């Protein structure tokens, strides 16, 4: 269930996985570990069986962690970004680059615990990752999100940064 918005791809539907990221003291969560991929693969397959294109992973405490293969950001009504603290998932290179790009554009970034109960407080959402780069999310469960200028601007800046590095 994917849609194209201009040249931007967005994930239309996401569910919240019943599988959770393990506690930090149970597995090396800050590395690409095969056991962690299994949890994400189970979550992705479960989502697809339910008619969703992706799944939102929660951490061991029940807070928002990431997508099955990408980090996640939310945008609030003040155009500030919120992203989970990377304490149970890989702090991706693309995630780090997006945080730096946002700061260079004077966009505040809050790295913090995000409860699933807060999903309705945000009006924008996107994923970051090597494959995803910056991919807007249209909805998670019953919460709808807009593809706004902040997200499109970050996507354009990231695209320019990547092309610039590839040309060098």
Which residue stretches match the model-derived regions?
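Single conserved hydrophobic/aromatic residue that forms the stacking wall/gate
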Residues: 1-6, 10-11
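Conserved beta-strand and immediately adjacent loop positions that scaffold enzyme active sites
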Residues: 1, 54, 71
């Amino acid at each position: 269930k994917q849609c194209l918005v201009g040249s931007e791809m967005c994930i239309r539907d996401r569910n919240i996985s019943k599988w959770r990221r393990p506690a930090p003291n149970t597995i090396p969560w800050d590395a690409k570990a095969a056991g962690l991929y299994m949890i994400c693969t189970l979550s992705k397959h479960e989502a697809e069986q339910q008619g969703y294109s992706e799944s939102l992973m929660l951490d061991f405490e029940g807070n928002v962690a990431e997508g099955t293969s990408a980090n996640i950001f939310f945008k609030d009504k003040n155009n500030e970004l919120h992203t989970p603290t990377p304490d149970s998932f890989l702090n991706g290179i693309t995630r780090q680059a997006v945080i730096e790009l946002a700061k260079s554009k004077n966009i505040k970034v809050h790295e913090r615990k995000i409860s699933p109960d807060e999903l309705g407080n945000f009006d924008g959402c996107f994923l970051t990752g090597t494959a995803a780069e910056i991919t807007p999310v249209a909805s998670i469960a019953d919460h709808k999100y807009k593809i706004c200028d902040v997200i499109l601007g970050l996507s354009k800046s990231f695209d320019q940064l990547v092309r610039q590095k590839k040309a060098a």
